[in-house]
Amino acid sequence: VPELEAVFSAMEQCYNRITGSNDAKIQYNIGTKEIDVAYTDAQGMRMRIPLNQLSDGYKSTISLVADIAYRMAVLNPQCLGEVCKKTDGIILIDEVDLHLHPAWQKQILHDLTEIFPNVQFVVSTHAPEVINSVAREQVVVLENYQALPAPAETYGKDANGILRAIMRVKERPDDIMEKFEQFYHAIDAQEYTLAAEILGNLDEILGDDPDLTAMHIQLDLEQM
């Protein structure tokens, strides 16, 4: 059935992309009456598992791709196996990052546009890893019922930079930010003993942290 082949092909491409595999095959298991995915694992063994045993992230992404491919196949049966490549359109996806590991969030938009190259995707997200995978011109910030352009470049920016510049969210909890402010106030007031106490407290809470390393250096320099 051409429609089913198109759906299975899209699912296979999706599985290959999110797992790094290159030979996934989606198959119907007559015995269990379930859909399985067969692939070669890192040890070279051929594996076969039911799709419903995959993680939520895998299942939600593959199900999304399968749903899009199925709708394309039904609407454009004349395209046969090329339906995913030839069908154009606009698709809206709410919370595209839902259930996805951060590593997948970074590539989900790229993967969707590779599998469906003639589709324009309009997605919502709260994940910095999704936002920093596209250029500033492709981002619209919704704030107080207004659609605003991204206030800064997004592509390639680190997650903390996205939180600060685009989402306007502090990258640390308020109580930690307050301790940072107390440290710098103590430095400004030349209360170095107090600054050292605050910094020691932050060391206990945060452990190895590049910002704390810089603060230790600053405190040492101030006391010279």
Predicted feature residues:
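Extended helical coiled-coil dimerization/tether regions that scaffold
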Residues: V1-K86
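Loop/turn-to-beta-strand initiation segments
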Residues: T87-G89, P117-V122
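Walker B catalytic acidic pair
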Residues: D94-E95
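Conserved D-loop-proximal element of ABC-family nucleotide-binding domains
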Residues: L98-P102, K106, S133
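Conserved Walker B catalytic segment
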Residues: A103-N118
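RecA-like P-loop NTPase motor core
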Residues: H110, E114, E129-M224
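Conserved H-loop
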Residues: T125-H126
